[in-house]
Amino acid sequence: MAKKRKKKLSSPEGISHIHASANNTIVTLTNTGGDAITWSSSGSIGYKGSKKSTPYAAGIAAETAAKVAIDLGLKKVIVKVNGTGSGKDTAIRSLHAAGLEISEIHDVTPIPHNGCRPPKKPR
């Protein structure tokens, strides 16, 4: 079955969502409306186990997603970072190194104002 060819983007601006958990880093590039253009993760590249959580794997994932998005016409992104994983800084640097212009960086990690009590382990 043939792969569907993606169309060029109508606007060269978009949003980069970086979800950096303790075990994996997921990079999703969307248009300004929030529709996904492309995505990549440390696991989808081929890393398994503890190697997925490394900053190097996060950088490669961001670079892979950025190259596909640039081919489709993306030039400028707003970066939204979510999570406390080790790969978030490297992912941002890789997006810039791949050729995307970063206009803003937002940390959108949800932080409770002393909400629900966590289960045994995190306490």
Curated annotation (Swiss-Prot):
Question: Would you identify the family this protein belongs to, as annotated?
Answer: Belongs to the universal ribosomal protein uS11 family.
List, alphabetically, the NCBIfam families matched: PRK05309.1, uS11_bact
Q: Which domain of life is it from?
A: Bacteria
Keyword Nucleotide-binding appears in the UniProt entry? no
Task: Please provide, alphabetically and separated by semicolons, the GO molecular function terms listed in this UniProt record.
Answer: rRNA binding; structural constituent of ribosome
What name does this protein carry? Small ribosomal subunit protein uS11
Check the record and name the PROSITE patterns matching this protein. Answer: RIBOSOMAL_S11
User: Subunit structure, per the record?
Assistant: Part of the 30S ribosomal subunit. Interacts with proteins S7 and S18. Binds to IF-3.
Q: Name one GO biological process term.
A: translation
The function of this protein is: Located on the platform of the 30S subunit, it bridges several disparate RNA helices of the 16S rRNA. Forms part of the Shine-Dalgarno cleft in the 70S ribosome.
GO cellular component, as recorded: ribonucleoprotein complex; ribosome
Gene name tied to this protein: rpsK
> Which Pfam families would you find in this protein's record?
Ribosomal_S11
The UniProt keywords, alphabetically, are:
Ribonucleoprotein, Ribosomal protein, RNA-binding, rRNA-binding
Write the signal peptide boundaries: none
Region Disordered, residue ranges = 1-22
